[in-house]
Amino acid sequence: MVKKIRLLGDPVLRKKSKNVERVDETTISLIKDLFETMYATDGIGLAAPQIGVSLRIFVMDDGKPRVFINPEIIYKSEEKEIAEEGCLSVPEVFEDVERSKEVTVRYMNEHGEEVEESFVDYSARVVQHEYDHLQGVLFIDLIPSSRRFAIRKKLIEIVRQSQKTDYAERP
């Protein structure tokens, strides 16, 4: 089911997410919701907190759909890249963010199997962005304070919109 995206200002986006204890029907249902919502909003990645669930799960499709459960970044390259990022939870805001060019992640997939995988370039950026969501970090936290100040009116408007949003599920 396509879920509403939580916006900047929603407290769930600032909480450190809890580990998933086991992959069960509820977890599989959440994963389906994440993929459906991500595809419906033309995203390339989506973390559970973005749909109001404070669990350590995110999905990504960089040409290959993947599920990351309880991910840990175990390696970040010292080589960095700066590129523009946006976020469904911070709509219509795009800013340059510095990230590691390569990361290695240990995670559990939707079958409960432990996976260790390395990502480079754009895929590494997406993994780091979604992982940050599980830590309660948004990409706007990583931009210089002068840029945050420059876009403050936009950010304030998103927070106001978030406060007016009714997240109750409709049949």
Swiss-Prot record:
NCBIfam families referenced in this protein's UniProt entry, alphabetically: pept_deformyl, PRK00150.1-3
EC code(s) of this entry: 3.5.1.88
SUPFAM superfamilies, sorted: Peptide deformylase
Residues annotated to bind Fe cation: 87, 129, 133
Known catalytic reactions: N-terminal N-formyl-L-methionyl-[peptide] + H2O = N-terminal L-methionyl-[peptide] + formate
Family matches, as Pfam families: Pep_deformylase (PF01327)
Organism from which the protein derives: Pseudothermotoga lettingae (strain ATCC BAA-301 / DSM 14385 / NBRC 107922 / TMO)
Keyword Repeat carried by entry: no
An annotated Gene Ontology molecular function: peptide deformylase activity
Cofactor note: Binds 1 Fe(2+) ion.
Enzyme class, first EC level, given as a word: hydrolase
Role according to the record: Removes the formyl group from the N-terminal Met of newly synthesized proteins. Requires at least a dipeptide for an efficient rate of reaction. N-terminal L-methionine is a prerequisite for activity but the enzyme has broad specificity at other positions.
Keyword entries, A-Z: Hydrolase, Iron, Metal-binding, Protein biosynthesis
Family classification: Belongs to the polypeptide deformylase family.
Swiss-Prot/TrEMBL GO biological process terms: co-translational protein modification; translation
Cofactor requirements of the protein: Fe(2+)
Protein name listed in UniProt: Peptide deformylase
Residues annotated as the enzyme's active site: 130
